[in-house]
Regions:
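Phosphate/diphosphate ligand-binding glycine-rich loop within oxidoreductases
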Residues: 1
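Acyl-donor binding region in acyl/amide transferases
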Residues: 4-145
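Intrinsically disordered, low-complexity, positively biased terminal segments
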Residues: 101-206
Length: 206
């Protein structure tokens, strides 16, 4: 079955997310530490209100100003652990590493995701950087995330965007409890899609 039949009817495309300036600085606003949580809460609610949603399709963005060896390490790590073996989607002009793949392979010698993740986090910090927040969040959301490669977005500041697909029912339990189950507990009426969801979304029509 092709991606058009198996995935597209049950997939929500994730648009570009942006954290408001008021929430980007922890020192100025303590609520900023919850900005990403709010994003996941919204996606969790979406899966409850729209139970036919099985997949999230979107992209992770990195900027050309990010240190090159760090970018290559992140992309190599993602490919090693999340590469789409089925080639469901491929970039027309895929982005290549700027450092030899053999050099990157020698860095990630862990036996599993957790060991390699610790290596990645350590090496990126040694460079004086952090793993980009959204990239870090996505790679820790589901062990079966599919990675579709990376390409340059010429129409959006030459950013480097990596395509991903996440199966909703394979989101890690801790994330599910935090962002999906919590919504159901607070809004049980959302489970009754035809009778309750609209009242939840459009309170003035309740």
């Amino acid at each position: 079955m092709c991606i058009r039949d198996r995935y597209m009817p049950y997939t929500v495309e994730l648009g570009r997310s942006f954290v408001s300036l008021d929430y980007q600085n922890v020192r100025k606003n303590s609520k900023s530490i919850f900005a990403l949580d709010n994003l996941w809460d919204g996606l969790g609610a979406l899966t409850v209100i729209n139970p036919d949603v099985r997949y999230f399709f979107g992209k992770m963005t990195m900027y050309p100003s990010y240190i090159r060896i760090g970018r290559d390490m992140i992309l190599y790590f993602l490919k090693k652990h999340f590469d789409d073996k089925d080639h469901l989607i491929v970039p027309i002009h895929p982005l290549s590493y700027e450092h030899p793949e053999e050099q990157l392979a020698k860095i990630f010698t862990g036996a599993d995701f957790r060991e390699d993740y610790r290596i990645l986090n350590r090496e990126i910090r040694h460079l004086g950087f952090n793993i980009p927040p959204l990239v870090n969040a996505y790679m820790n959301l589901s062990p079966t995330m599919k990675l579709f490669g990376t390409a340059i977005n010429d129409g959006f500041g030459e950013v480097e965007e990596t395509g991903i697909l996440i199966a909703v029912d394979e989101i890690l339990d801790e994330k599910r409890v935090r962002h999906i189950d919590s919504f159901v507990k607070e809004h049980p009426e959302a489970l009754h899609i035809t009778s309750g969801a609209n009242k939840l979304i459009y309170k003035d029509r309740a």
